[in-house]
């Protein structure tokens, strides 16, 4: 049996799916046609019902749950893993002046409209409306060249923004943790409801096995991860994996499900 499967080229996703899609584990007769795209594209495809299995932002879950089931394995949740709002030093005279009113007047780059990052930003700044939606890896440059006043960054940009002379206004993930007392639900894996539930459970278990295989061979970074890592260093790849792949990736559990449910009620 062959199914379509979509996820991002980011190290956490390629780390999770490497063993599964490259047949490093026994996939029990199941194979995949793989599509790697940025998270906003994945979210749009999910709304269209395009993929059998896909990574999505939890921010879009309310728009797709009628046609997809959420898997327990393969997701990204945790503590200290949220998006950051960053800017150039001197945009406002001093960091303590980054008030709600000041942010409301700024043009903000967001990594996609239907993303968890956008949802978390809107939770912290509900009256900020000057938004520009961009692919996540374009946001640092948009801030640096003055196209926008500030930007919400995700993924590996958490590890690079300071080296490029940018500064943090707020950690949106920390804001979520402080206000909700739950881990940050960033993204999860979904399966079409039209697929046999037994097969969905089988794939869920295979993703779990794929993650365990990856960890058994870590900290060596697999060629599949390096191939799709967009010129980042192996140290940054490991930072990325260490931050985003954890026990919640193996199994959402009750705390993970509670976090997802809370996010989708906002």
Regions found by a protein language model. Give the residues of each.
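A short beta-strand-loop structural module common to alpha/beta enzyme folds
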Residues: 27-41
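Bilobed "Venus flytrap"/periplasmic-binding protein-like clamshell domains
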Residues: 2-22, 36-37, 83-149, 156, ...
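Hydrophobic/proline-rich hinge and linker segments of small-molecule sensing/allosteric domains
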Residues: 70-97, 176-194
